[in-house]
Amino acid sequence: MQLLRCFSIFSVIASVLAQELTTICEQIPSPTLESTPYSLSTTTILANGKAMQGVFEYYKSVTFVSNCGSHPSTTSKGSPINTQYVF
């Protein structure tokens, strides 16, 4: 009798834990870039016969990964370099 009661309690606990651990598959967001550059570099550039100072901003891509179901999916965006020229 005690053994049946123990199994009954165990099955209730297992059911509650299974509900808590259920994975919810949602649409993953669109890929984005960080709003601030992680690095900057400068160099002197000669363009159209004029010397300029080039400022290069490097951005990291934010990648979202979903491992729901049998087909994992990701969204990512390339890490661009933003170039600015200072005269």
UniProtKB/Swiss-Prot annotation:
GO BP terms in the entry: agglutination involved in conjugation with cellular fusion
Keywords, sorted A to Z: Cell adhesion, Disulfide bond, Glycoprotein, Signal
A GO MF term: cell adhesion molecule binding
One CC-aspect GO term: endoplasmic reticulum
Signal peptide span: 1-18
InterPro entries xref list: Aga2
Purpose: Receptor binding subunit of the a-agglutinin heterodimer. S.cerevisiae a and alpha cells express the complementary cell surface glycoproteins a-agglutinin and alpha-agglutinin, respectively, which interact with one another to promote cellular aggregation during mating.
Entry protein name: A-agglutinin-binding subunit
Organism: Saccharomyces cerevisiae (strain ATCC 204508 / S288c) (Baker's yeast)
Gene: AGA2
